[in-house]
Amino acid sequence: MATIFKRVRLLNEQGELIQTDIKVAGGRIVQIAHDLHAEADDEVIDVDGQFVAPGFVDVHVHLREPGGEHKETIATGTLAAAKGGFTTIAAMPNTKPVPDTKQHMEWLVNRIRETAHVRVLPYASITVRQAGKQLVDFVALKEAGAFAFTDDGVGVQSARIMYEAMQQAAALDMPIVAHCEDETLTYKGCVHDGSFAKRYGLSGIPSVCESVHIARDVLLAEATGCHYHVCHISTKQSVRIVREAKQAGIRVTAEVTPHHLLLCDEDIPTLDANFKMNPPLRTKEDQQALIEGLLDGTIDFIATDHAPHTKEEKSEGMVLAPFGIVGLETAFPLLYTHFVEKGICTLKQLVDWLSKKPAETFRIDGGELKVGAKADFVVIDLHTEQAIDPNTFVSKGKNTPFAGWTCKGWPTMTIVAGKIVWQKGRGE
């Protein structure tokens, strides 16, 4: 038995929208053609001319389980991913316990298998308990199912530890993924060291806090040959360092978040902790450098850094509240409305940044719509306008700075391995 998705509109290689049908069987796309004939036992789903994109791939998601289930679970986080059109996500390791041993990783892999709605690739930590002192057993964790290695949530403070981590990762041909933050330069800040911090008398986090770590790690990547990936890049200096590293032939890649592309510290209206994230919103100049870096290929793709927290935690105020915002359910509508519709980028560029590019960067089987590919894709209504309402999120986290923003480009159906895992109006 096969499933035929009729009257889909998808992008061809020239970036033009064409109408066709997609036939799926055995979890793979087996045919893409006009007016496909359905056999008696085939299921037919009429998409009614809506846009179909490859399932989005997000390599930066905090699912909080184990240990933080009051914020999010694998089940709720992956349902939020499905609602946002993401069919593959990578789970960050800042959980309790940290996936820093074979046993912890095996538990996580089994839990994902039992409860996830989409494909989940689990990160292992770089150091034991993410404490930055002792390296994990890289070989054992890879064998247990680790996708890559990161201490995201904190930066690796020791150059020696990072150097030795890159040596081990390079030997296994696996990436080191870095949250870049020199803790001696954070000044215990809660926002960027800029206009907003000065207005409210807050301690600010300077841009150099990030860029000095990237500069260090680029040299370590050059010395080891390791694939080094920069998380949530946020400053113009960081973009310059990554650009120069790529020009020098160093294996460096980088991601940027929707919120750093769409907001700067001038956009923070009040002491609202829904605008508190790490790295913080930077200057307008930094924001423009991020956009330019994405457009010229210095920055490889977009990742959400989905970081759910409870309403109570975010109500503690800008200084005390935890860093982080949610992003899985709003990424595409926000970027389609404010980038594609405003002519900053094309629809094909946006889709590639959310699917093909991260898949290529991390050698993930996905991110493309073609015969033989996994049948992971998303159906999107490009025309209906809708305001972002956190109360409708399926994520446990409602912490977004984009509440009330009106957007187009809302997913209506998400398919993983040929099966519908989320559909608008069904089970919401």
UniProtKB/Swiss-Prot annotation:
Keywords: Hydrolase, Metal-binding, Pyrimidine biosynthesis, Zinc
Biological or metabolic pathway of the protein: Pyrimidine metabolism; UMP biosynthesis via de novo pathway; (S)-dihydroorotate from bicarbonate: step 3/3
InterPro entries membership: Amidohydro-rel (IPR006680), DHOase (IPR004722), DHOase/Allantoinase_Hydrolase (IPR050138), Dihydroorotase_CS (IPR002195), Metal-dep_hydrolase_composite (IPR011059), Metal_Hydrolase (IPR032466)
Active-site residue numbers: 305
EC primary class: hydrolase
CDD domains: DHOase_IIa
Entry-linked PROSITE patterns: DIHYDROOROTASE_1, DIHYDROOROTASE_2
Gene Ontology MF term list: allantoinase activity; dihydroorotase activity; zinc ion binding
Necessary cofactors: Zn(2+)
Hydrolase listed as a keyword: yes
One GO BP: 'de novo' UMP biosynthetic process
Free-text cofactor note: Binds 2 Zn(2+) ions per subunit.
Residues that coordinate or bind substrate: 62-64, 94, 278, 309, 323-324
Residues involved in Zn(2+) 1 binding: 60, 62, 152, 305
Annotated Zn(2+) 2 binding sites: 152, 179, 232
The reaction(s) this protein catalyses: (S)-dihydroorotate + H2O = N-carbamoyl-L-aspartate + H(+)
EC number: 3.5.2.3
Domain of life of the organism encoding this protein: Bacteria
UniProt GO cellular component terms: cytoplasm
Matching Gene3D superfamilies: Metal-dependent hydrolases, Urease, subunit C, domain 1
Family: Belongs to the metallo-dependent hydrolases superfamily. DHOase family. Class I DHOase subfamily.
PANTHER family: ALLANTOINASE
HAMAP family: PyrC_classI_B
Role of this protein: Catalyzes the reversible cyclization of carbamoyl aspartate to dihydroorotate.
Protein known as: Dihydroorotase
Protein's gene: pyrC
